[in-house]
Swiss-Prot record:
Single GO MF annotation: ATP binding
PANTHER family associated with the record: UDP-N-ACETYLMURAMATE--L-ALANINE LIGASE, UDP-N-ACETYLMURAMATE--L-ALANINE LIGASE-RELATED
Pathway membership: Cell wall biogenesis; peptidoglycan biosynthesis
Record's GO cellular component terms: cytoplasm
UniProt name for this protein: UDP-N-acetylmuramate--L-alanine ligase
Length: 478
């Protein structure tokens, strides 16, 4: 287990460098809701920083050393009550002015994972890990516990309408948290219940190979009192021995499994089995077999906590999903617009397969995949896999790569991704610039299309523009 620094929750201030990020803001929100002094910097105001301000956090829209002085009060030099605990993510480097000032002044500096680990230790915690499905699974666990009256604290990597953001502070004994493996900090967490949805090589900026990823998950698994894991992942089935297992395949001998998966009237439906005994039918709003799997993990956890299956199933049936996870953004000119965070080849395959269910269920004419590759390192590592990831789409449009702050040391481009896709797909287009993508898509999209905007970058910003363009066209016709 990695050494976890001691975080002070007894009144010492917190200052977050880059407080508007999805992971940082969730932690800051919980601390502010606990009535702890919280400040942070982010270069531009967003609805996330506005929510933090509403919770009592002080937000600076500049990054400079003076920001650290907000809560500094007279007293013994560097007294625990007079200086802030400075919180950083992996994205913050030594050149950041606030980081430099905190280091030079001897202020305590923590990685955001240290704060999450300390919060996990404060509760009966459920931590959800895995290469894919973390946000949906952790959000759904939180939602089920909330609907069951257990009033959980929730920290996830996406925004959920049920608690109007990416975090909520409850008064119950449970904390549900999304546990990120991307930088190896997963090994700091020791929850009561750990969940592993699947394990694949991702984040090649940190991991050299799958073996290193497995080692990280192994260390996490050993620190969980109860491990819940999916046997549909070959890596898990081969290398892990979960306390509680689940699988979509009844032949794998898992504790929880399903049969008779169907798509009907906009819902995924499946019969659920617990150690060979029939529990009942489960309905899931968010499409795709991978979301049946995510929901099955939630059933396993709910049952372990003593919840009746009917309570769990009723909650699952009303869960609308997290934002940017097959999120319906609107309709215009007979075209349906979907925003999804998929950015790994496996995620793209799963999302586009789910879109096919939607096409059959809603009778859309075509599925149009608009994809923005995310990070140069990931694009380089999975270039060939991206080529074959779009087989379920009728048309593919690719943009240039969203860097996420990386340096392009391998000189990889979106054009190369497009070339790989064209080896497998005859209707693939490359349009690098987002600034003119909306106009380009006007020439491609047709009434009856399902337009899927895919990626973890800023591609989804084009969707409001598209909706506006179609409204303008309609106004001109009228």
């Amino acid at each position: 287990m990695k050494t976890v620094k001691k975080v002070n929750f007894n009144g010492q201030p917190f200052h977050f460098i880059g407080i508007g990020g999805i992971g940082m803001s969730a932690l800051a929100y919980i601390l502010a809701e606990r009535n702890l002094p919280v400040s942070g910097s982010d270069l531009r105001p967003t609805h996330i920083t506005q929510r933090l301000q509403g919770a009592g956090a002080h937000i600076f829209h500049r990054q400079e050393a003076n920001n650290l002085a907000l809560f500094h009060s007279p007293g013994p030099q560097n007294s625990s009550q007079t200086v802030p605990q400075v919180i950083c993510s992996t994205a913050i480097n030594d050149h950041n002015k606030e980081y430099q000032a905190a280091r030079d002044l001897g202020y305590p500096i923590f990685h955001r994972s240290d704060v999450l680990a300390a919060l996990i230790a404060d509760y009966d915690s459920i931590a959800v890990a895995g290469t894919h499905g973390k946000t949906t699974t952790s959000s759904l666990i939180g939602y089920v516990l909330l609907e069951a009256g257990l009033d959980p604290t929730i920290i996830v990597g996406g925004e959920v309408d049920a608690w109007e953001g990416n975090a909520r502070l409850g008064q119950g004994r449970f904390l549900v948290a999304e546990a990120d493996e991307s930088d190896g900090s997963l090994t700091k967490h020791a929850p009561k219940i750990g969940v592993i949805t699947n394990i694949e090589l991702d984040h090649p900026d940190h991991y050299q190979n799958l073996s290193e990823v497995i080692d990280t998950f192994h260390e996490f698994a050993h620190q969980c009192q109860i491990l819940v894991a999916c046997l549909d992942c070959d890596t898990i089935a081969e290398h892990f021995r979960p306390t509680i297992s689940y699988s979509l395949d009844p032949e794998k001998g898992a504790d929880y499994t399903v049969s008779e998966i169907i798509y009907e009237q906009g819902m995924m439906k499946a019969s659920v089995w617990e150690k060979g005994s029939y529990l009942g039918q489960m309905e899931v709003k968010i499409p795709g077999q991978h979301n049946i799997s995510n929901a099955l993990a939630v059933v396993a956890i709910g049952r372990y906590l003593g919840l009746e299956f009917a309570v769990i199933a009723d909650a699952i049936a009303t869960f609308a999903g997290a934002k940017r996870r097959f999120e319906h953004k609107g309709e215009a000119n007979g075209i349906t617009f979907i925003d999804d965070y998929a950015h790994h080849p496996s995620e793209l395959l799963a999302t586009l397969a789910a879109a096919k269910l939607k096409v059959e269920g809603k009778q859309y004419q075509r599925s149009i995949a608009i994809f923005q590759p995310h990070r140069y390192s990931r694009t380089t590592a999975f270039l060939e896999e991206f080529g074959s990831a779009f087989s379920s789409a009728d048309v593919v449009v690719l943009t240039d790569i969203y860097s996420a702050g990386e340096v392009n040391i391998n000189h990889v481009t979106g054009q190369q991704v497009a070339e790989q896709v064209r080896k497998h797909h005859k209707n693939a287009y490359y349009h690098p610039e987002l600034s003119s993508l909306g106009q380009f898509l006007l020439e491609i999209l047709q009434p009856g299309d399902l337009a899927l905007f895919l990626g973890a970058g800023n591609l989804n910003q084009v969707i409001p523009e598209m909706l506006s363009l179609y409204r303008e066209q309609l106004a001109v016709r009228v």
